[in-house]
Design a protein with these regions (language model features):
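Solvent-exposed soluble domains appended to multi-pass membrane proteins
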Residues: 1-120
Length: 120
């Protein structure tokens, strides 16, 4: 869900021969923008699971999540939901785990059998 152009992932995917790149611009809903890096993990991963279910098989996909990057913010609706620990990053790592779990729940709902090949 990163801003298009972040770390030049969009340019790399094109140069590497990939046929598509999906980032903040393609997501198209800035109400989920974190104010810094891009789209918060939970909504972007849900959107990604739905998007992946429409891709022709076989396909290869990589996902770059943003929440574990400074300034370590979680969406307003999740503030106080995750343990903070002694370092700021712990709260966003817990949020990232939550978002990833929601991604797999969404992926299981899809009819595509391509989700059987997900690796982390």
């Amino acid at each position: 869900g990163a801003n298009n152009g972040s770390m030049e992932f969009d340019r790399f995917t094109e140069q590497a021969g990939f046929t598509g790149y999906f980032g903040r611009n393609e997501y198209g809903n800035d109400k989920d923008f974190d104010g810094n890096w891009g789209i918060f993990d939970e909504p972007f991963l849900k959107w990604t699971a739905n998007k992946m279910s429409t891709l022709p098989a076989p396909f290869y996909s990589e996902i770059f999540t943003i929440s574990s990057h400074h300034p370590f913010t979680v969406p307003k609706q999740h503030i106080g939901k995750f343990p903070k620990g002694q370092i700021p990053m712990l709260e966003v790592v817990a949020y990232g785990d939550y978002a990833l779990r929601k991604f797999f729940e969404e992926a299981k709902k899809q009819e595509s059998k391509e989700f059987d090949g997900i690796n982390i």
